[in-house]
Regions:
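N-terminal organellar transit peptides
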Residues: 1-57, 68-217
Length: 217
């Protein structure tokens, strides 16, 4: 259904990444250090919890420990433009929360129950990762709110303020070798790559907007 694609699939991928990191850390007996240099919110923070230690910049965005589902309702629009919606399913609940159909109370209740289950699971991950480091009540920490890196440190959501180069050199010495694995340039950036600065800026804006949407912000 539309709800399952927009809600469960995203959380499932994020939780899978978290689980795989923890499995590899345990298998290889390695300590995991996470650096949130930009944003570690919502699913990003869930993944960050795979770290034995979490560091961030003072201006990083941290938290948003919650579950969100959003969509639009187009029922009045398709009536105005004379469009007839035709849906054929095997299973009466397959079209749950279809944006072209009226919302049903029972569908909203079902969605809310799923959100509560996922939120509970998210909270358990955070509590397992941060345990006694958390310094505020559940009501405040798990409300879906997000904070700056500096405030997140005060709340116990991260261990300290600092970037990867600084922290790793402090821990392992000035001669430590840091290998960086960067994401390859996206299809959009390659397609819009140009000597025209305005085109490049537009590509960057579109990519940044897409990234923030993934964090649920």
């Amino acid at each position: 259904s539309n709800a399952s694609r927009g809600l469960g699939d995203v959380y499932k991928r994020q939780h899978l990444i978290y689980s795989l990191i923890r499995q590899q850390a345990k298998k290889n007996k390695k300590k995991v250090i996470v650096f949130a240099e930009d944003v570690a919110a919502s699913g990003g923070y869930l993944i960050a919890c795979a770290g034995d230690e979490i560091y961030a910049n003072s201006s990083s965005i941290i938290g948003s420990i919650g579950v969100i589902y959003s969509s639009f309702g187009f029922t009045e629009l398709i009536k105005k433009i004379g469009v007839e919606r035709r849906v054929h399913t095997a299973g009466k609940n397959k079209s749950t929360l279809d944006p072209f159909l009226d919302e049903k109370k029972e569908d909203i209740e079902r969605l809310k129950n799923i959100q509560l289950d996922l939120h509970k699971d998210f909270i358990e991950v955070v509590e397992k990762s941060r345990s006694s480091k958390l310094k505020k009540s559940e009501v405040e920490l798990f409300s879906g709110e997000f904070w700056s890196g500096r405030k997140a440190k005060d709340l116990g959501l991260i261990d300290d303020i600092g970037n990867a180069n600084q922290i790793l050199r402090e821990k392992f010495g000035e001669d430590v070798v840091i290998k960086k694995f960067e994401k390859s340039k996206s299809w959009l950036s390659k397609k819009l790559s140009s000597s025209n600065d305005h085109v490049d800026q537009l590509a960057n804006i579109l990519e940044e907007k897409s990234v923030w949407q993934k964090y649920g912000l």
